[in-house]
Amino acid sequence: DTDRSRGLGDVYKRQAQVNGVPPELVTSQMRSRAKAVNFGIVYGISSFGLSMDLSITRKEAAEYIEHYFETYPGVKKFLDDSVENAKEKGYAVTLFGRRRPVPELKSSNFMQRNFGERVAMNAPIQGTAADIMKIAMIDVHKELKKRNMKSRMILQVHDELLIEAECSEVDEVKEILRDKMENAVKLSVPLIVDMHTGKNWYEAK
């Protein structure tokens, strides 16, 4: 679960508190809106797009976005810098140096340029997350193989890994997952893993 960090609490709940709502009064709807704004921002969402996502007026959506940037000015600077760097170099880059060409930034078509800006904002974030996940997958696979375990990694979905585990190996698999996923890379914030088990994927949710 990437919504939380040890010692930092629920990041989306804290964002909802920015509007002056005491922690105990933050509702699930407020948290959901904060989460939608957070993810929408890194995709370069417009006030129209956010208004559609949250079923609110365009004016309210614009106020959400404006308030977000006022509260987190560093995010605005990062996104603006990401676009400028991509315009200068012709590509966006992840934390690990992987490049994503963004030719749309030079398009004569306004819609294409807007798309390019959204890519330039999002690629360093989502691309870095993908890089980290791939490192974790390689490390988990190697460890399962090293221990000659019967359990196998069978699926990756966004920031989740699905393991088909032998009943006798469940605890050991959990230990491996936590270690390899939380230590895939050292960042200034911790990587936290939540795990669920079940006889099938549905039960594990």
Predicted regions and their residues:
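Conserved catalytic core of nucleic-acid polymerases
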Residues: V18-M149, L155, E166-E169, H196-K205
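Single conserved hydrophobic/aromatic residue that forms the stacking wall/gate
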Residues: D1-Y12
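C-terminal structured "cap/appendage" subdomains that terminate the fold
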Residues: E143-D194
